[in-house]
Amino acid sequence: MKLTQDQQDLLDGKFGEGAKLAMKVQVAIGESFGAERMVPITRAHVALSNQDADRWLAEKLAGLGAKCRVRPTVNPGFCLSYFKKMGVVTNKDYEEMERTDRAYRALGAELSYNCTPYMDTNVPLFGEICAFSESSATPYVNSIWGARSNREGANSALFASITGYVPEYGLLLDENRHGNILVQVEADIKCDADYHILGMCGKKIGHGIPVFAGLPKNITKEALRNLGAELNTSGSYDMYHIPGFTPEAPDIKTAFGGKEPERVVTITNDDLAEVLESISLPGHQPIDFAMLKCTLFTGHPVRRVHFAL
């Protein structure tokens, strides 16, 4: 890889051992993907977790003196003061979360504790190069905002935040952002939740960048988040297009880069029913409780739940 002087200085340890470690791993990632250079980022999001390995790395980097050049937002943890007061977590859980919080503060992260920052607090501009981890984030920033991010892991996004660079490959390159699968949606898509089920059809859609035709004209931001999150978890999709809706697909021809789709897939009501059946309890058993993930909720679904209760 061809490195600039600043990048080489990072690799040589002139900015400290923490930044050196981060750059060393990033160069290795770039070489494994055939990247020719590193490019600067302006935004980042780290899928922070409180698990041992992730916390160990954050503490190690902080201990080596690493500081984030690009201040990242982070995924959810729990509110230390509130949960301690309520007494709903064990002392061990509290202490581990406190360590995670302390490590990311030392690194200079923005402790937003929100896994959907791309919808409000960390919104990239069209064409902006970013490093976003979190399964729902990468499809959203690429597809809906037209920004550019590869599917970063929590650790690689943290390394990018520290160095301020990412290797240039994959979805950072124009030629890799065109669709190659036409998905004809003949199923009835009636509400935001249906986009969850549509996204879980990844096994039938197959690997690539899908271009969806036949969707309703008015799609909420929550529905788009649902679609991208399930596409990424069901089939590792980093991007999709909706002609006439997403910024890089003003029409279907542009969505495919002027080429014909490699394959055409049709999604019917039967496909949605099959997916729904696969994630349901056998025999349609009653559920014991429902957990509403507030970090994924925006104002609209919160209001719906409020009025339903």
Specify the residue positions occupied by each region the protein language model found.
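Non-transmembrane, aqueous-exposed alpha-helical and coiled segments at domain scale
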Residues: 1-308
